[in-house]
Amino acid sequence: MLDKSLPYKSIIMRMEAAVAERLAPPAPAAGYRIRPFVPGDERHWARIETSVGEFSEEAAARAYFERVYLPEAALQCLFVVTEQDEPVATATTWTEEEASLRQLQLQWVAVEPAHQGRGLGRAIATAAVRRAVRLAPGEAILLHTQTWSHRALRLYR
């Protein structure tokens, strides 16, 4: 959950490609597995992101996802799912391209509150970074976060 009691400050973290390429494969907790986006998962992304306070309404979250990510979601979005294939955590990678600048980013890492504390955030973030560097070898990856996500900062170190 976001801790909005703190003043908001933007934080940019960078992982060099050599470090990202050496990350060990993620190991989700027993009863969970990681899978890529499949059509219809935009509603799960919206539910998960709203559950952690990133959006106030699922409809707004879904509209954002559809506008920004949907055309390439299968390449960029991963989920941690339960044994019943219910998504409970997500992470998205994105390549920002502006003029001749290209920057790989990890975005929207979230775990539903009922499933937090089981290492799922670390597992999904690691899986997303590993997948991104396979698709864009040699590129560093940025993570934009904020002080409201201070609990997650340990995860990103």
Model-based region annotation:
Residues 50-111:
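A conserved beta-strand-loop-helix scaffold within acyl/acetyltransferase catalytic domains
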Residues 33-45:
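A short beta-loop-alpha structural element at the N-terminal edge
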Residues 1-30, 38:
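Acyl-donor-binding surface of acyltransferase catalytic domains
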Residues 106, 117-125, 132:
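Glycine-rich acyl-CoA binding loop
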Residues 132-145:
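Conserved GNAT acetyl-CoA-binding A-motif
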Residues 127, 131, 154-155:
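Structural preference for long, well-ordered alpha-helical segments within the folded cores
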Residues 118, 122, 147-157:
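Conserved active-site alpha-helix within GNAT-family acetyltransferase domains
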Residues 107-117, 145-146:
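A short, internal acetyl-CoA/4′-phosphopantetheine-binding micro-motif in the GNAT/acyltransferase core
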